[in-house]
């Protein structure tokens, strides 16, 4: 039985280190993005939906490509990098509110939402006019949030 106890202790140490790594990563991401508020959660959902609907649209058009898919993922990653940069500008340079971060998040919410609607149209799904209007309005008004 002593061998088993030694293995359990090693495994517990590994688990502890993994927990610390995830806690550190979560802390960094929370700091970098300015916390995970409703806007950021919505952006995550919109980005995932846009990628998924884009893959569906490409499959229907028989245009699936791993290269195009990789570029799409790279663009999605850059969206979140820009949100983080906007948050750093707000918190470290302007030191006043979250106007830049919010404007960047709204900009990409509108872009990703409109892209989902375009993908839905390619798939053959009718798109509600009110939804199109709301996303277009959000895209137009994104910069009005910035009061520097």
Predicted segments with their positions:
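Short, Lys/Arg-enriched N-terminal segments with co-localized hydrophobic residues
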Residues: 1-10
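Alpha-helical phosphate/pyrophosphate-handling elements in metalloenzyme active cores
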Residues: 16-34
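Helix-coil boundary and interhelical linker segments in multi-pass alpha-helical membrane proteins
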Residues: 29-40, 90-100
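Alpha-helical transmembrane segments of multi-pass membrane proteins
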Residues: 43-54, 79-87, 107-115
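Juxtamembrane/interfacial segments flanking transmembrane helices
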Residues: 56, 115-134
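Juxtamembrane helix-capping/reentrant segments at transmembrane boundaries
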Residues: 61-82
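Hydrophobic alpha-helical transmembrane segments and immediately flanking/interface helices
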Residues: 92-122
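Conserved small/polar residues in nucleotide/adenosyl-binding loops
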Residues: 146-148
């Amino acid at each position: 039985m002593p061998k088993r106890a030694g293995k359990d202790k090693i495994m517990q140490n590994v688990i502890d280190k993994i927990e610390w790594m995830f806690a550190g990563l979560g802390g960094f991401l929370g700091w970098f993005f300015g916390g995970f508020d409703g806007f950021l959660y919505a952006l995550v959902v919109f980005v995932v939906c846009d990628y998924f609907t884009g893959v569906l649209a490409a499959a229907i058009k028989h245009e699936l490509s791993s290269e195009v898919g990789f570029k799409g993922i790279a663009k999605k990653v850059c969206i979140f990098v820009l949100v983080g940069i906007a948050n750093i500008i707000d918190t470290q340079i302007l030191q006043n509110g979250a106007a830049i971060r919010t404007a960047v998040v709204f900009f990409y919410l509108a872009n990703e939402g409109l892209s989902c609607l375009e993908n839905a149209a390619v798939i053959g799904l009718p798109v509600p006019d009110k939804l199109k209007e709301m996303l277009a309005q959000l895209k137009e008004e994104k910069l009005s949030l910035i009061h520097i």
